[in-house]
Amino acid sequence: MPDFDAIITGGGIVGATAALCLARRDRRVLLVDSKVPQTSGLNDEFDIRTVALSPRSINLLESLGAMVDVRRESIKRIRVWEREGTATIVFDANEIGAKALAEVVEVSALVNQLWRNLVDRVEVRAPSTIDAVECSGDAVELIIDEDVVSAACLVVAEGRESSTLKQLGISAQNYGSMGRAIGTVARTVDPHDGCALQHFGDGILAFLPLPEERTVSVVWSLPTGRYDELLTLDRKAFAAALTHESESALGDVTEVGERVGFPFGQSLVPDFNPLPRALIIGDAARTVHPLAGQGVNLGLEDVQGIQEVAQHLKDDMGEIDMWRRFAIRRRARARVMLKLMDFFDRTYGASGPYGRWARNLGIRTINKVPAVKYQLMREAMGLGPLATLY
């Protein structure tokens, strides 16, 4: 008999949530990570790393008691527009009778709460090193810190730079846009009123509302040359650049915090169940353009799918047929999202009069067909049929 029903590698939002979901189904779970998250108290300043969670993701995390003491702010509207042309679209929660389209959450606070909830429910090895992985039809064996540990199922949730996938010889294929982005927290003259802003111009600039009404989380996806230039500006000059690029949508940007740069891209593994008893979820399975704001939400959809499948399995967590269906459906969902994001990126990136004309026509069509807009919002909120494709 294996030592565990499941070994989960990666203790971020997706991996820790998966561990808690399986544990509450009375499964024996081992969570392995190369590091331990910082568990210090909350700072006065909002974390640079934020995530926009769909209502479905919020419901899952609340059911696990993971949203306690986690600061968050509702996104009630999303306005998307471009510098040239008139391609503007607004998504409003009121249009579908919802309180919010999403909630912006601090990553560090959420991970800390998830890890606190792991105590006495899940065995955790961190910081630990996985030296070898072997998957067979009978069990999965890992060498962790020179100890041999077995499980009925391996769940890889380590993110885009997964060392476990490298050991298994599995690599993701690039899918469309690649680039770099700058993240920070900014203060503005005007209040955000719960509205997220996304501007297509010199790259893609997003303002996400934070609990303080004149504070926003900033993610600016940029071409390489422009990225290098902006990252070297002093804070005053960078604030001025944000004011200009956002077209003063919230008045002047008066202050910016520490900036972090990070790469982004779209990628997809060939198979979410590439070997017997092995599953790949979250950013380890696929990465999407930050304009989507859906990376973590897709990973939490994976977790809900795993929870659903585990509920129908009796003893053996590694039963092959059920996981094949799960893997095929989750990858299909990922392909739809990747193609949609690539379409938006190319559409808004098209220059010239014909590009603007086509873009404006498409956006006006969406605005005039409530059913299309309604379905787009429901899918983004994790409530549409594609979101439950597992």
Outline where the language-model segments fall.
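Conserved N-terminal helical subregion
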Residues: 2-3, 59-62, 72-167, 175-180
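N-terminal Rossmann-like FAD-binding beta1-loop-alpha1 element of flavoenzymes
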Residues: 4-31
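Conserved FAD-binding catalytic core of PHBH/FMO-like flavoproteins
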Residues: 61, 146-148, 154, 158-261
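FAD/FMN-dependent oxidoreductases across multiple families
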Residues: 230-320
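C-terminal helical "tail/cap" subdomain of flavin- and related membrane-associated enzymes
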Residues: 308-390
